[in-house]
């Protein structure tokens, strides 16, 4: 029935007292349908029997600080009224009195007469009608006076709009559209000037249609261009301050050296990088948020705004955080549906798993078989995974294991931007040259990532040699803690992040509340390395003795060095007296950990010549290591010399003072109280490390015990599917090897 009524864009909106349908067309004219015939009822004023001449006229406003100023006044001030009328094609004429005006016009009284303006030009009407807010003042002004800026100060005075607001209007006209916004507006075929946008915005008020507030097609996901936004905003602020103060022409544009930096660090969306694992590395670039500079207030984002919108499909994945920021912070899919580099969303045409699910879910076999709420926990668990020596490439794969390295930063993988060849390889770095002549490099060997206040040691390796050629997108170096060369394609790098175990699914005291038990053998397989950094601050004049060496194995009670205070030999003490005094004055910091000394760095504020000989020797050795690593990876060569901006635990390093950082790497096998992840997302706490052996009926050793109830209660099938598939693949592999050897 509606299809028959709603022809030529009209819409049904009610019925008469006789039950006759009423429709409204695109021109806001109402019709009743009588026996298939459309009978005009007029506009809304006619239907409601209201005098349209006396009815208020709609007009658009623009907010400047705390005041709302009609768009017509702003446009008139910036362009002149005649130009505004011409641009909007507004028809107007002079009349003797209001009675001569039809319902299609409204009037404004000026000093030189009464002028009628056409209401049927809806955009022009909304702009010009704003002048009615100043009708008392306009009676003393001629129409042509509004072509001059000075006249508008009289209008502004009526509404107590001071020069501060006027200058803001002028600056907004100059600075509102930045270069990035201009390019986007051009792509959208929209106006690229402030005045043009005011007119376009008024035009969009012509109807009541508007996109949903959560419609992603009406938004942009901005990346590092936000940094340019901070810079532009601070520059604009400085220019505004300059123009507001520049009364006598002697002021200067003043931008503080830390203004931009302070604006960035005050942004509430800022987060420290966590170099803990390659998936977390991806997540930090896939994360999107509604808060931050230019964003929304988290407290104002209610349930409706946190729901998943249809337009999110193909851009925003299932992954979000498990806190009060749920859906305020979310993660993009592994291949979001962007139409350009500015983060604009297009129409989704091809639906595939990488385009819908997050990187975490794409790495989780059978995750689509799990309860939807539990799939999100794959992403959550991936933020806390650390490297273990027993990791291997998964037997059951999704295929995304090959993509991770190509998306990672240099801490985890170094991928070729173009084809080229290797220039040099040392134990501390690799340098390559692309076909376009550009050189790049990455540090090899031990590097340290930071996450949540801890240091995590990573080992960057390469299989390439000097003068070897490579292809575009080939992984040139990778983190061996998380990646290995693929056995099928030696040029491909596959992610390794799993350890397969024979798990007995049973209920016992060890599986209460999702806990688990593991064998001693399996515990030793899961050895994780962490690095403890000992910081020692000393003065240049102090001597150091018996300093530990790089590569040395130390115990918790071993001394890292002996520091002698400045008791100076110029006092003429004999050798025995000096030894007594030195023994009283010396400091000897302890290691506090059992591990291996992997690196010693010295950062100093001052000149090497001012140091004691022992400290200078240590600093020179540190500088040599730092410089060699930088040179070997095509980086600018630096040393440990710093200034007073360098801080040790938040305190600036004083002049003629040095910080010695000793990196001690510790091995930690999985033990009671440690957390593990069963299958994709089943977090468990180790309740017992079994020093006895449990076997299956056919004699196979059990590596771990976990509760089947824990799996069943969470409606996840992936643990069962992964376990059975991996077991089957191992049997098939053994059969294949047996056939090959026979």
Regions found by a protein language model. Name each.
Residues 165, 532-537, 737, 741:
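A generic structural motif
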């Amino acid at each position: 029935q509606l299809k028959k009524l709603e022809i030529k864009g009209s819409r049904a909106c009610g019925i008469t007292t006789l039950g006759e349908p009423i429709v409204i067309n695109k021109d806001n004219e109402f019709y009743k349908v009588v026996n298939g015939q459309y009978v005009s009822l007029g506009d809304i004023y006619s239907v409601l029997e209201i005098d349209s001449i006396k009815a208020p006229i709609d007009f658009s406003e623009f907010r400047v600080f705390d005041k709302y100023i009609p768009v017509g006044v702003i446009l008139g001030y910036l362009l002149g009224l005649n130009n505004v009328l011409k641009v909007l094609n507004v028809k107007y004429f002079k009349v003797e009195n209001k009675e001569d005006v039809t319902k299609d016009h409204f009037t404004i009284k000026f000093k030189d007469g009464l002028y009628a303006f056409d209401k049927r030009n809806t955009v022009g009407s909304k702009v010009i009608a704003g002048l009615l807010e100043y009708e008392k003042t306009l009676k003393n002004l001629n129409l042509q006076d509004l072509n001059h800026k000075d006249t508008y100060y009289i209008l502004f005075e009526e509404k107590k709009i001071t020069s501060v607001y006027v200058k803001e209007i002028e600056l907004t006209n100059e600075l509102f559209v930045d270069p990035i916004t201009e390019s986007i507006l051009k792509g959208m075929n929209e106006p690229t000037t402030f005045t043009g946008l005011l007119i376009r915005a008024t035009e969009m008020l012509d109807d009541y249609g508007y996109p949903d507030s959560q419609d992603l097609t009406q938004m942009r996901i901005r990346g590092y261009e936000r940094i340019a936004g901070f810079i532009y905003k601070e520059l604009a602020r400085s220019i505004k301050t300059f123009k507001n103060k520049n009364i006598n022409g002697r002021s200067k544009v003043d931008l503080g050296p830390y203004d931009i930096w302070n604006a960035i660090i005050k942004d509430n969306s800022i987060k420290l990088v966590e170099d803990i694992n390659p998936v977390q590395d991806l997540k930090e670039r896939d994360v999107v948020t509604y808060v931050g500079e230019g964003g929304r207030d988290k407290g104002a984002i209610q349930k409706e705004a946190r729901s998943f919108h249809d337009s999110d499909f193909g851009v925003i994945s299932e992954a979000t955080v498990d806190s009060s920021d749920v859906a305020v912070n979310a993660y993009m899919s592994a291949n979001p549906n962007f139409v350009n580099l500015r983060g604009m969303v297009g129409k989704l045409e091809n639906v595939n798993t990488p385009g819908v699910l997050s990187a975490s879910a794409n790495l989780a076999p059978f995750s689509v078989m799990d309860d939807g709420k539990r799939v999100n926990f794959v992403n959550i668990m991936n933020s806390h995974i650390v490297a273990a020596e027993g990791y291997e490439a998964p037997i059951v794969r999704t295929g995304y294991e090959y993509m991770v390295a190509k998306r990672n930063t240099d801490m985890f993988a170094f991928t070729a931007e173009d084809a080229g060849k290797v220039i040099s390889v040392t134990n501390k770095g690799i340098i390559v040259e692309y076909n376009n002549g550009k050189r790049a490099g990455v540090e090899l060997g031990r590097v340290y990532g930071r996450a949540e206040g801890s240091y995590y040691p990573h080992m960057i390796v390469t299989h390439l040699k000097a003068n070897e050629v490579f292809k575009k997108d080939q992984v040139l170096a990778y983190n061996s803690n998380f990646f290995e060369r693929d056995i099928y394609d030696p040029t491909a790098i596959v992610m390794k992040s799993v350890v397969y175990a024979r798990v007995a699914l049973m209920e016992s005291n060890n599986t209460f509340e999702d806990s688990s038990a593991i064998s001693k053998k399996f515990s030793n397989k899961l050895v994780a390395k962490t690095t403890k950094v000992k910081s020692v601050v000393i003065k240049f004049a102090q001597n150091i003795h018996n300093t530990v060496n790089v590569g040395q194995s130390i115990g918790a009670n071993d001394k890292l060095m002996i520091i002698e205070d400045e008791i100076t030999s110029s006092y003429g003490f004999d050798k025995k007296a000096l030894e007594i005094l030195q023994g009283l004055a010396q400091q000897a910091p302890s290691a506090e950990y059992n591990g291996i000394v992997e690196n010693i760095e010295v950062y100093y504020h001052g000149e090497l010549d001012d140091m004691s000989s022992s400290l200078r020797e240590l600093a020179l050795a540190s500088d040599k290591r730092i410089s060699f690593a930088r040179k070997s990876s095509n980086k600018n060569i630096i040393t440990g010399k710093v200034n007073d901006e360098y801080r040790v635990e938040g305190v600036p390093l004083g002049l003629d003072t040095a910080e010695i950082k000793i990196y001690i790497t510790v091995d930690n096998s999985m033990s009671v109280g440690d957390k593990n992840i069963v299958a994709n997302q089943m977090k468990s706490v180790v309740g017992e490390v079994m020093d006895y052996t449990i076997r299956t009926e056919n004699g196979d050793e059990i590596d771990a015990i976990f509760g089947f109830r824990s799996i069943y209660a969470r409606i996840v099938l992936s643990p069962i599917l992964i376990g059975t598939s991996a077991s089957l693949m191992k049997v098939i592999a053994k059969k294949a090897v047996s056939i090959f050897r026979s």
